[in-house]
Amino acid sequence: MPKTYPEELAEWVKGREAKKPRQDKHVVAFLAVKSDVQAALDAGYAMKTIWEHMKETGRLRCRYETFTQHVKRYIKAAPVASPPPPATPPDSQPKGAKPEPKAAPPASESKSEPPKIGGFTFDATPKKEDLL
C-alpha cells in the first residue's frame, strides 16, 4: 500500500533536519582549537595562514570570515586578567586617629579656552578687492 502524503512529508522533514547544518558547530570546533590558534597568533603567524592550514588538515570546516569573527570574539575580545591592586593592611592607622584628608590637586585659576580649529569659513558677501 502506498504511503499517505503526511507520512511521506514526515520522512522528508526528518531527512531535511538531518542535512541542515547547525550554526553552533563551527563555534564548538573553533573553541576546541582555540589554544592552538592563540599560540600560533602569539608566534606571529597570520590568521589567513592559520585558517588555511586548519582547513586543509580538517580541524576546521568554516569559512575564513567565520574564523576571523571567532578570533575577534573569543581571543582578541576576551578579558585579560589584570593583577589585583596591592592590598593595604587595614590596621595601618591607630583606631582613634582620624585619617588625614587627601590634598586636592591645585586648581588652575585661569582656565584657557581650547584653541580654535582652523579651517575654511564661507562669507557670502564678497569683498570688493577680491572681485578686481
From Swiss-Prot:
Cysteine disulfide links: none
Compositionally biased region (Pro residues): 81-92
Residues covered by region (Disordered): 76-132
Top-level taxon of origin: Bacteria
Coiled coil: none
UniProtKB keywords: Plasmid
Protein name, UniProt field: Protein TraK
This protein's encoding gene: traK
